[in-house]
Amino acid sequence: AKSEIAFEFPARHDDLMGTLLGRALALLPPKEADRLAEEVGHEYGLHLAAEMAPGDAQRSLHSAVATVAETLTSHGFAAHSEGTEGQLRIVSEHCPFGQAAIDHPVLCAIDRGLVRGMLAGLYGETAPELTGSFATGKSACTTSV
């Protein structure tokens, strides 16, 4: 006799959580909200880096950026790394925060913090800069390293 196994997958609530987070951050002064969102992203990025390479650092910035892009993809960002004219970038073609990031651009600071934290753990301190985002009408979120 065959037995059937039922699989249940929880519904994704990224938009709901993103909206809630965006509204909560909107209650703070803008600079404080941005700082808090980036700080939380940075802490989580450090955690992710420690899980990827406990005690090991990447040997090159290029390698670390590629690893960060792969990790962002595994978290719903559909990211890839690219480099031109000596500048490395992480391009995310999807945002797991969806419409919430467009409605509450402060959520982009979480992404910036994630990138900064992962790079700090894998390579060393860097100063990534968000140079384009869905929230500003671009077709992708681009972080320059």
List the predicted regions and their residue ranges.
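Non-DNA-binding regulatory cores of transcription-related proteins
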Residues: 102-118, 122-123
